[in-house]
Amino acid sequence: MKELILQREFGKGFDFHLRNAGLDFKEVQIISNAMMKAMKHGTLNLKSFSLSYNPEIIYQGVGLLVKAFPPQIRELGLVGCDLGDEAGEGIYQYLENSALELVCIEGNNFSSVLMDKFKKLREQKPNLSLLI
């Protein structure tokens, strides 16, 4: 994958799911760059995003993604991506100020300390379904 172009979608938005697609950090860079470009032009009507079961996206990839997500995104899936606390902290910080309603991040390698932080955040945000 060298380039990804996201085109304007009308209506309620679209889902972007590439589960178990063998993606790595380089491809995550392409995806996040495309999202940033589309958002800059007001054309990123993304409602659901999942890169679950792509263990090569690494924590730097997660860092790029959380910077590229549009404000209207409602669902996030990063299940079984072999993510550790560094990526988890990035997700946590994003969740604190986002309007996400469903987040599925189970099957990663988060410490018990970070898991407790996620559980407290889930209690503070009753509109958030958080699967850890």
State where each predicted segment sits.
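Leucine-rich tandem repeat or coiled-coil scaffolds
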Residues: 1-132
